[in-house]
């Protein structure tokens, strides 16, 4: 509880910045968080913003009806420890890829080998998802292929999940995403219920956190955006920005390489100089992850922390 109290004070005391440093730091501003939340709700309508009710504690740097995102009653049929083990060498490759400059190992979104084996996880693939409305692009056209990037970073994503039991261990989770002022990134909270709708204890909720993360990134906390006391397990965001920054760099390299290959294959005619200048500018934009796509990628990594929670249970194409 001491860690939870310190975290709450840190959130309260940290000043809010509205200067965007997303491309250089991997952090986002409150305005970018709102944009990312709108994009998530548009792409996946099972996510929604909070209602501006009397039970909500408002923070003045966010709109009253956009304090946090929520998806309710998400199924969870198996405990985290029941997932199939995969090769620890994959996790080692990823850890080595996100070392601090001083040589220390970062622990956010980390897939560590350690004493416990790494777990397989659900995949939220970024392709083949079409938002509602006309004249829109698919996720595969608007976002980088995160599965390819994760593979290049040495992270394995398997579908070798054990068979789902016949609802004897069925649970449900309400998932919340809010903005962390101290880390300037999204922060996830989960609140669990058993099959009959009774709240889970914190100890029971920890059963659905991957063992490698229970002591590193998961904390028992009161939901900070409700006036009533509701116990939850939070996923600590201490290194999210660093991992996002690494992804940004990798996206830049991968997409530029692909563009160069396409240019070589289709070098039949050259555009005029004015077109060249505009194309270079457009390519620079296309070579990056946009800030409003942050939460799509964020949820991709959260599945490694909560492998049994079916984040994609109504989201065809994830």
Curated annotation (Swiss-Prot):
Residues 122-137 have a biased composition (Polar residues). Keywords: Autophagy, Cytoplasm, Protein transport, Transport, Ubl conjugation pathway. It is found in: Cytoplasm. Residues 83-164 are annotated as: Flexible region. One of its GO terms (molecular function) is Atg8-family ligase activity. Residues 260-273 have a biased composition (Basic and acidic residues). Monomer. Interacts with ATG8 through an intermediate thioester bond through the C-terminal Gly of ATG8. Also interacts with the 40 amino acid C-terminal region of the E1-like ATG7 enzyme. Also interacts with the ATG12-ATG5 conjugate. PANTHER family: UBIQUITIN-LIKE-CONJUGATING ENZYME ATG3. This is Autophagy-related protein 3. It comes from Vanderwaltozyma polyspora (strain ATCC 22028 / DSM 70294 / BCRC 21397 / CBS 2163 / NBRC 10782 / NRRL Y-8283 / UCD 57-17).
């Amino acid at each position: 509880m001491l860690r939870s109290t310190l975290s709450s004070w840190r959130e309260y005391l940290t000043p809010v910045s509205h200067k965007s440093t997303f491309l250089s730091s991997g952090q986002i501003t409150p305005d970018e968080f709102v944009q990312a939340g709108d994009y998530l709700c548009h792409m996946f309508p099972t996510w929604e913003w909070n209602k501006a009710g009397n039970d909500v504690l408002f923070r003045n740097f966010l709109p009253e009806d956009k304090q946090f995102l929520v998806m309710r009653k998400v199924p969870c049929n198996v405990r985290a420890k029941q997932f199939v083990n995969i090769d620890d060498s994959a996790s080692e490759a990823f850890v080595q890829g996100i070392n601090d400059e001083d040589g220390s190992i970062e622990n956010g979104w980390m897939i560590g080998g350690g004493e416990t084996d790494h777990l397989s996880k659900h995949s939220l693939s970024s392709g083949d998802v079409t938002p509602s409305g006309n004249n829109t692009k698919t996720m595969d056209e608007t976002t980088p292929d995160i599965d390819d990037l994760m593979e290049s970073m040495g992270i394995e994503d398997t579908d070798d999940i054990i068979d789902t039991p016949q609802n004897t261990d069925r649970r449900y989770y309400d998932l919340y995403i809010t903005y962390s002022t101290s880390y300037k990134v999204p922060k996830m909270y989960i609140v669990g219920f058993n099959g009959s709708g009774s709240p889970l204890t914190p100890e029971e909720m920890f059963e659905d956190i991957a063992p490698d993360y229970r002591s590193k990134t998961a904390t028992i906390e009161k939901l900070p955006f409700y006036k009533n006391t509701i116990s939850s397990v939070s996923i600590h965001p201490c290194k999210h920005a660093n991992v996002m920054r690494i992804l940004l760099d990798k996206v830049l390299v991968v997409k530029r390489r692909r563009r160069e290959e396409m240019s070589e294959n289709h070098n039949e005619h050259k555009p005029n100089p004015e077109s060249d200048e505009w194309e270079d500018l457009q390519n620079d934009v296309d070579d990056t992850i946009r800030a409003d796509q942050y939460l799509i990628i964020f949820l991709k990594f959260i599945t490694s922390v909560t492998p049994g929670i079916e984040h994609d249970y109504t989201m065809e194409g994830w």
